Swiss-Prot record:
Database matches in CDD domains: RNA_pol_B_RPB2 (cd00653)
ATP-binding found in the keyword field: no
GO biological process terms, semicolon-separated: DNA-templated transcription
Known catalytic reactions: RNA(n) + a ribonucleoside 5'-triphosphate = RNA(n+1) + diphosphate
Pfam family, one: RNA_pol_Rpb2_2
Transmembrane segments: none
Protein name: DNA-directed RNA polymerase subunit beta
Described purpose of this protein according to its UniProt entry: DNA-dependent RNA polymerase catalyzes the transcription of DNA into RNA using the four ribonucleoside triphosphates as substrates.
Summary of subunit composition and partner proteins: The RNAP catalytic core consists of 2 alpha, 1 beta, 1 beta' and 1 omega subunit. When a sigma factor is associated with the core the holoenzyme is formed, which can initiate transcription.
EC code(s) of this entry: 2.7.7.6
Matches recorded under Gene3D superfamilies: 2.40.50.100, 2.40.50.150, 3.90.1100.10, DNA-directed RNA polymerase, beta subunit, external 1 domain (2.30.150.10), DNA-directed RNA polymerase, subunit 2, domain 6 (2.40.270.10), RNA polymerase alpha subunit dimerisation domain (3.90.1800.10), RNA polymerase Rpb2, domain 2 (3.90.1110.10)
Organism per entry: Corynebacterium glutamicum (strain R)
Lineage: Bacteria, Bacillati, Actinomycetota, Actinomycetes, Mycobacteriales
UniProt-recorded Gene Ontology molecular function terms: DNA binding; DNA-directed RNA polymerase activity; ribonucleoside binding
One annotated Gene Ontology cellular component of this protein: DNA-directed RNA polymerase complex
Amino acid sequence: MLEGPILAVSRQTKSVVDIPGAPQRYSFAKVSAPIEVPGLLDLQLDSYSWLIGTPEWRARQKEEFGEGARVTSGLENILEELSPIQDYSGNMSLSLSEPRFEDVKNTIDEAKEKDINYAAPLYVTAEFVNNTTGEIKSQTVFIGDFPMMTDKGTFIINGTERVVVSQLVRSPGVYFDQTIDKSTERPLHAVKVIPSRGAWLEFDVDKRDSVGVRIDRKRRQPVTVLLKALGWTTEQITERFGFSEIMMSTLESDGVANTDEALLEIYRKQRPGEQPTRDLAQSLLDNSFFRAKRYDLARVGRYKINRKLGLGGDHDGLMTLTEEDIATTIEYLVRLHAGERVMTSPNGEEIPVETDDIDHFGNRRLRTVGELIQNQVRVGLSRMERVVRERMTTQDAESITPTSLINVRPVSAAIREFFGTSQLSQFMDQNNSLSGLTHKRRLSALGPGGLSRERAGIEVRDVHPSHYGRMCPIETPEGPNIGLIGSLASYARVNPFGFIETPYRRIIDGKLTDQIDYLTADEEDRFVVAQANTHYDEEGNITDETVTVRLKDGDIAMVGRNAVDYMDVSPRQMVSVGTAMIPFLEHDDANRALMGANMQKQAVPLIRAEAPFVGTGMEQRAAYDAGDLVITPVAGVVENVSADFITIMADDGKRETYLLRKFQRTNQGTSYNQKPLVNLGERVEAGQVIADGPGTFNGEMSLGRNLLVAFMPWEGHNYEDAIILNQNIVEQDILTSIHIEEHEIDARDTKLGAEEITRDIPNVSEEVLKDLDDRGIVRIGADVRDGDILVGKVTPKGETELTPEERLLRAIFGEKAREVRDTSMKVPHGETGKVIGVRHFSREDDDDLAPGVNEMIRIYVAQKRKIQDGDKLAGRHGNKGVVGKILPQEDMPFLPDGTPVDIILNTHGVPRRMNIGQVLETHLGWLASAGWSVDPEDPENAELVKTLPADLLEVPAGSLTATPVFDGASNEELSGLLANSRPNRDGDVMVNADGKATLIDGRSGEPYPYPVSIGYMYMLKLHHLVDEKIHARSTGPYSMITQQPLGGKAQFGGQRFGEMEVWAMQAYGAAYTLQELLTIKSDDVVGRVKVYEAIVKGENIPDPGIPESFKVLLKELQSLCLNVEVLSADGTPMELAGDDDDFDQAGASLGINLSRDERSDADTA
């Protein structure tokens, strides 16, 4: 249950412009936003601050609501709700209060290394009162370790970083809807009263015009039965509802005379088969709707009901239904059915009568991380409450203490269950800084109490007008979750009730004011809102007579300027952070923009990051708030700087040292590395970025590289979105990334003795052991490839009866001679790299290990992956493709000054996909690289000079530009600037005014017949790397049943020769090849051993036998009681068993043990 004005609302953070040392971007923005984007992690941080009641949060609340305001945190709320817990007789009670935390036990790095939680011990004050003796006992009780949020908005659970995603749910309240009856085609109306916790109450008018009620989804009964059960007389019902014929006819036909009969009637419908009594029936009705323990509207439900029905009043403490609520709901329903448009509420207010749209954001609210954890703690405490009651009854009253009553296990189990298994607690996406940031701002309609992807229809997934400025209409996944998972818009924040608000500038009588109001979707419906690019003069007066505005339900209209109430604060208000980083978004089709927003999250951080020539102005802020940069909170002078740490002497004389994270593995296996940006002796200001993180450059989000791109077909090699790259990109490591894999092995106690980590491995040459140290662990810096030993380990074998010779050896050499198996950890198939880290945990060193584990070793292997054929590249406009060919630099097309292009994209990738933004980005990219100089005196530049800001008339080569979404560079500006681009050092202008250049074929030296569009595009290397997908096998594991190879790279499986491949072989008449593929190369068990023998002995390949899968098919048919047998040519039944003697003999002669265990790592063929 949400409490008061307590749930944190996002606070304004430092403006981007104030970030010291920020790189300059030349912006084409025409609209200046009156406020900056709120803190991008406030959604997570503020909600958690409310839950645990941090001192900063309390200070903010007091500042907002005054010193005297009562401020309670989320945990305090639940303890108040639960207390006091009384025994069944009411003689004893236990109250819990004052939740408080001790210091966190381990640092974040220790928690990650030791695979434990980053958590703080939670204590509460428990007070036991014996009402008969008046005795009070008070104790501090330890509730358990409570996971704490890091300053980046994440949790460390069992050593891995996780994010709790905010959940979009239907808000508690009262909802009216309309359906059309199929038989009569008349509109029928219904209403649901939905609580936060408790039974649903539903009223409806059926096709026979009777008003009915359903309690808790049970059988329908006349609504007047419920009213009479509540104590209403026929006269009272007639007085209140006499205006409605359908209510009067329902009253006449309800068949109950008084309150007692009505109560018994309800009881019979709710509990069929039980013998009703008046008291039972009364308590059933009371418990259903009027007892706070069983029924809870929550503050948000009470707020929605009062607002919808015009009931006024605060009703702050009243979280159950009242008779007035029920009566007004029924009146609203019958007036709605009668076609009335307005009604007068009980307190005299005129309210509109209309149905509700369940997909409207006024009816959907967010459960943020604090509320989700609070609900889970509530579940745990209610389980604990039952235990406390039982113990109060069974224990001796004299000796009871609070500690003896409380069993904290249900609470800690509920918290552990939520973080470990809930659909909303997710493994954090750490592919790059942006993916982590957008993961924390994700909104999910799935999860407990939400929708399921199977049942969700088109309507709930679709974009709704009320999403504007609250949830991004573009950023959503492409699969079965489309529309169910969204992203918070850039300016949005969450209000105390959990509704998403977005800011607007107040307009009074056609004049802008400095007032910024945050409106919910419900409130916004009552106002007329203008666009952010509405023209106004220096005093704020709107200059246009008529203004384009947005009305209720997303309708667009033209109205007089005095009719406008509000104006958008920024053109990028409607999109999320990820989408706001797509330049020229306004020129892209929404489907491709969706792919572009999603693919930015899949970009791998490169060894050398580079800021985009063409940005949107959001890069700085996204990187700053993502939490991967090192930012100094103090001003001072850099005293010491190295790759590992930076020391700053602050102005107040204190030294601050910042440790940098070097080459650590992320959740997705990419490399997390921080690099210093400051120099020794440099002056730094508070809030300045002093070190870059992964995928950032100079404190800006930099996920890819600026590449010189040409749009042209090239010998068919870039057909169907294939990409041609310059070999130079490979050689200069322009698209090279580092990937880190973690390999873990443990030495356990087995029934036959303890496993041992050792260098002494049986039957292994010294050459193989060259990189192992004396413990048997690989040294740091060793280059390893697949099959190399990382950690030597031996496991005791089951011992058989020893021969006299073995007994003699055992007597001479002791234990060393006993039988052990080599179970060393080796580099998996297909992996190579350099060992960059070793972690050794041992029980002897008092490390906390799992039961039965004596030692655990983790090896980190880093791999430098250059770009290669088969890797996936993408731009920011959904223009993705796979590298099809890497050409030598001398074969690439080149500009007249000799500059070869980096990448060739096919022209067919543009028109059909309607993502023209990529072409405009290419043109502006060239301009940013070459620079431009506009002569204001030149008459040809007259129009350009009018629209361009003064600082954009002269821009040097290699500058960074920003073209904000919906407010960027126009086509006219781009073509005007292309005509004024700066020449190269030889004085030649390479690209014409139309953005095209004459390219020369690198192979022949001849110019191409037509000019080619050329410029710089920002390209990302995506996580879909060919190294992780390509797979080949010669011998490997088999399935025991079918005797066919397993499938998939993870199982080291074979290639499936499927139905269509068989048809291809048949089409070419390749009968023998096909027979081999289906038998001896696959599952003809006898045949494949004989073939192995024939190859070894140099004989001819024998005829194939019967495949094992055919035998399996026969067995399956026989198991269905079908008598299936194989007949020979003369019609006699054949026995399918192979010649096992030959089979075993052949195997033995080849040294193959055919009777060994079927193990995936041992059984190879």
